[in-house]
């Protein structure tokens, strides 16, 4: 359990002034712990971006020089360990000891009702305090950068490509927030959702012979190391409508660095598209949008649209669509070898397109969806007026939920 006593606040760049003020009241040790974790994440993100840009520019040079060599063959390794079924209590069992929990403040989203639907209308909200849940979650991600000649440019987002899937069998409960100080972002939230990951595993890992050493990745090793993240604690402080105020993370003391990074990234992706309900009654066919900011290979502005397809007691079925656009309007190649292939060191966003589909079943007495899947791929194209080619970035996400039996 992530308790208030084991909580350390880590400020995020987008936090409000009050949150920054709250952070300033934390102890030096909490600030140091949070700073260390942010530094580690920033280092990993920076390294990932450097490798990605280097890979992109290498591809650019080959394309612009009309070289058609194919990439080295890839090896794929997966951990075949299956998710263990059982109740929330059985899953939690004797979990490994975790480090001090870190809290990441989340920006408040903007919710807009597009239609209240037809027939009988109902105010939808979570009523899950004191409940327990066991659910299997699959978080799949893919990212690709390539260069296309402008006369062959395709701006439409493709279907899902190669994905790395992290499977997270989780179990937990919902509590009334207690023991958090006023300096904790979201301390006055209505709900404290508290989960543990049990028996995580990963599949779909691919590394080429040319990039594996630079990336510091070993497919077989990571598939084995992910087991060290067993018992990873996570949760959030949230409102009854589903709005998340603070993400809570507590890595097991035994977890390896790569295992921590993989699970952290998957959990961050998980909370990037929460089911948030509007503050007015809705019926069948109702639609509302949620605007938020999400991070990943690049920071994106995201609009998630929910459509009610059925309401039966506490169960709500939703169709979901996602649209994304980059928060930054340009990509800088300055200082990178291979940038001479472009007419300018700065490439502007020329188009953005998202292909998405999804449907989720939500039990309002449970904090996570009990069934369903959400898939989306966003293609962002960067270019300039005088260039012969454009940089294309594709980022894909798939999330699946199924209740444990």
Regions found by a protein language model. Give the residues of each.
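N-terminal acidic, proline/glycine-rich, low-complexity intrinsically disordered segments
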Residues: 1-9, 69-71
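Bacterial N-terminal signal peptides that target proteins for export
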Residues: 5-16, 24, 36-55
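C-terminal motif of bacterial Sec signal peptides marking the signal peptidase cleavage site
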Residues: 63-66
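Hydrophobic alpha-helical segments and helix pairs
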Residues: 220-262
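Short, structured beta-strand/loop micro-motifs enriched in basic residues and often containing a Trp
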Residues: 264-273
